[in-house]
A protein has these predicted regions:
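Gly/Ser/Thr-rich beta-alpha loop segments that engage phosphate groups in nucleotides
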Residues: 3-5, 87, 105, 112-116, ...
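Hydrophobic alpha-helical scaffolding
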Residues: 1-2, 110, 128, 151, ...
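Glycine-rich phosphate/dinucleotide-binding loop and adjoining beta-alpha-beta core of small-molecule
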Residues: 1-102, 173-176
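Short, charged, surface-exposed loops that flank catalytic or proteolytic processing sites
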Residues: 57-66, 127-132, 153-156
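Short, small-residue alpha-helix embedded
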Residues: 53, 109-140
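Short beta-alpha connecting loops at secondary-structure transitions
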Residues: 54-55, 101-107, 117-121, 145-154
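Charged C-terminal helix
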Residues: 143-176
Length: 176
């Protein structure tokens, strides 16, 4: 990962200077917890532990009131916040909080957040507004996870979602 070194901090500071839209995950979130920033054209994607560090709360406190936590993330950091977990939440100021009703416990494995970040970034590259890219990305990711877990949730790997994402995206195109 990016780590928490002085080099990592300098890299993040340079990235934050750009006006381009960003999707921020993993170690970059941990760096933000140390040096908070506020911007409108980004999506932060913490799991409850990362959200706790960003908000100065224990992960259990985040889980206790996920709606307040995701609102707090947007208030403190701006942009759009995706609070990952069972019933992932997507919050953008001025919009209702979106709740993802798809996905499964097998998705709580290493690399799943990386896949989600890639899906959201790909949607942004297709010029979707950030809030829409976050909601659609979370839903597509969850649907792909459910398809990948059709044979059982145990042993599900992040790479198992890749082929399923193609099917889910193409199915969306057929209904559009």
């Amino acid at each position: 990962g990016l780590g928490r070194s002085s080099w990592s901090r300098q890299l993040l500071a340079q990235v934050l200077e750009t006006s381009l839209p960003l999707v921020v995950d993993a170690d970059a979130l941990n760096l933000l917890a140390l040096e908070p920033a506020h911007r409108e054209n980004w999506i932060i994607t913490p799991h409850p532990g990362e959200a706790g560090r960003l908000l100065g709360l224990p992960a259990a406190g985040v889980q206790q009131d996920r709606l307040a936590a995701v609102r707090g993330l947007v208030e403190r950091f701006g942009g759009t916040a995706v609070l990952k977990g069972a019933g992932s939440l997507v919050c953008t100021a001025g919009r209702p909080i979106a709740v993802c009703t798809v996905g499964n416990p097998g998705m709580a494995t290493a690399g799943m957040g990386d896949v989600l970040t890639g899906v959201i970034a790909a949607l942004i590259a297709q010029r979707l507004p950030l809030a829409d890219a976050a909601v659609l990305g979370v839903c597509l990711h969850g649907q792909a996870g459910d398809r990948a877990a059709a044979g059982g949730e145990r042993g599900l790997l992040a790479r198992d979602l890749i082929d399923e994402l193609r099917h889910v995206v193409n199915a969306q195109g057929e209904t559009a």
